[in-house]
């Protein structure tokens, strides 16, 4: 059994590949809890022989994960960004600078597609929101990074004297502070998605598919789908965003299925 580890800024998500079979559902922990992974490993009836993962939570957290796995006799191999990964080309000026979770999640989306596929946009709404585009040629064209919905909200509350930690509906014309903040956050997130979708449509000359992921998606789903519908007047009917529960783990599973995953 090979463990699949997605170590993000807020959450640690774990899956596995066992004789070609995937986990029925990912296991998620608070990534600030140093004992959660080790405690969970102690409950397993079958011990993993290898862990394959990506870590964007820093070297200290990566070492904590390594130590927890080592305590159960399981080595970990961290996937890092590089110019090409299983045919997915990394268009970053400095390929190693691209977050490994972003590259692997794009690989996870591509693993679902036919060999010939339209361009696609993947928007992941976590602590940070990333919106990345891949062309029909399997080349990562580039992407955006912005604060995620929760980080936008908490930043306003922390960085200003009079703004609350808002909880309000998204409306066209907000008439109180909670509405104004909630609507502004949704507009910023949705507007960024639509911007990148339109850019992909123009660049490739055809409609791009849209995939979404992350815990922040429900908060911005309605606004994103509404703005995409409005954008249809410009670029043709937009696709309904397809939600993916764990694209990073999907990409790691594809890597784990290779003959020698530790060489990747």
UniProtKB/Swiss-Prot annotation:
Cofactor binding: number and manner: A monovalent cation. Ammonium or potassium.
GO cellular component, one term: cytoplasm
Pathway where it operates: Cofactor biosynthesis; coenzyme A biosynthesis; CoA from (R)-pantothenate: step 1/5
Binding of ATP, residues: 6-13, 127
Record organism: Bordetella petrii (strain ATCC BAA-461 / DSM 12804 / CCUG 43448)
PANTHER family: TYPE III PANTOTHENATE KINASE (PTHR34265:SF1)
Cofactor entry: NH4(+); K(+)
One biological process term in Gene Ontology: coenzyme A biosynthetic process
Annotated catalysed reactions: (R)-pantothenate + ATP = (R)-4'-phosphopantothenate + ADP + H(+)
Principal location class: cytoplasm
Gene Ontology MF terms: ATP binding; pantothenate kinase activity
Assembly and interaction partners: Homodimer.
Function: Catalyzes the phosphorylation of pantothenate (Pan), the first step in CoA biosynthesis.
Gene3D superfamilies reported for this sequence: 3.30.420.40
Name of the protein: Type III pantothenate kinase
Binding residues for substrate: 92, 99-102, 177
Keyword Transferase annotated: yes
Localization per Swiss-Prot or TrEMBL: Cytoplasm
